[in-house]
Every structure is written in C-alpha cells, then in structure tokens.
C-alpha cells in the first residue's frame, strides 16, 4: 500500500473490514480518512466514516461484527453513541487508545465509483469533494477548507464544477459567496 496516513489501529480495522462481505456489500469508506489515505496523503484523520445507501442501518450486524473481531483488534470495550440519527462506535483498545467509527445511512447517491481496498469501496474523490463543498456550506470546519484546497490543487477541479456537483448531488442551492 506504500506510504500511509492511517494509524496502526485504523489500518488493522480496515484490513478486517475489507474482507468482510456483510460490511463491504453495504458500506463504503468516505470522508477525510478516505481522502487522505487513498487520494492525497495530505493530513492525518482520526475517525473512519462508513456510509451506506441502504435506508436501514443494521445495528445488530455491526455490533456482532465488532464483537466478533474484538480479540483480533485488542478491543476491551465498545461504546455506541447516537446523535441526530448518526451512529458512532467508539472502540476502546487494551492500551486505552480509541478509534471512532461511524456506520451511517447517507441518502445521496454517489456521482461516480471510486477505488477499492480489497472488497471495500472507497468513495470517489469527486464525491468527497462535492461532500466537502456541501459541508462547508452547511457547517464549515477548518479541515474541510483544507481538504477542498488540496483537492483543487492536486486534482485540477474547478470550484464552479464542484459547486455544480454538490448542487446536483444534494439538490441544494450553493453559491460561491457563501463558501468564503
């Protein structure tokens, strides 16, 4: 895989996820970790975002999967948090380090297919860019501006095209002035 920005815990987790058919047929990796690890290598990212286009997220399936792999990953405790319908799992390892993993329904169809890591689909850089534009419009965070800057710099995407992609994907009016 070459140079990685993943922590050893993130890598171990994704190495197991990429071979689990019950997870890989439902979920894809997206967000800052996908962007940083598989496309740009520009920053560290702390969590793992696994999204599905299936309306019902099977909590039981996820919990069984996490418990089944607890000993392989040296997990001593799993905490679940639900905030505004978003489900996060906090994996607490025997060395007391933590990894946040989100398993969530994302109702917006992807623009194009991305890469694959084993059997795990990785969101395309174009989709991640459109998601970043939407996120900046709705709830800006510094890291999203940083990600968008590096996407545009390294991928020759133009802001107008990314705004159009976000408008189409999210059916939302977004203008340049709001993004700054």
Feature annotation, model-predicted:
Residues 1-180:
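Compositionally biased terminal segments of proteins
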């Amino acid at each position: 895989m070459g140079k990685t920005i993943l922590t050893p815990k993130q890598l171990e987790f994704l190495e197991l996820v990429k071979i689990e058919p019950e997870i890989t047929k439902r979920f894809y990796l997206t967000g800052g970790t996908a962007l940083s690890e598989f496309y740009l290598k520009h920053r560290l990212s702390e969590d793992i975002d696994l999204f599905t286009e299936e309306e019902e997220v099977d909590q039981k399936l996820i919990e069984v999967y996490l418990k089944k792999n607890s000993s392989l990953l040296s997990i001593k405790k799993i905490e679940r948090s639900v905030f505004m319908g978003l489900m996060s799992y906090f994996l607490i390892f025997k060395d007391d380090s933590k990894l946040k993993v989100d398993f969530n329904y994302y109702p917006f169809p992807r623009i194009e297919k991305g890469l694959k890591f084993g059997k795990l689909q990785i969101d395309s850089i174009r989709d991640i860019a459109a998601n970043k534009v939407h996120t900046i419009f709705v709830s800006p965070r510094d890291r999203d501006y940083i990600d968008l800057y590096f996407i545009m710099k390294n991928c020759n995407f133009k802001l107008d095209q990314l705004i159009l992609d976000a408008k189409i994907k999210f059916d939302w009016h977004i203008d340049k002035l709001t993004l700054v």
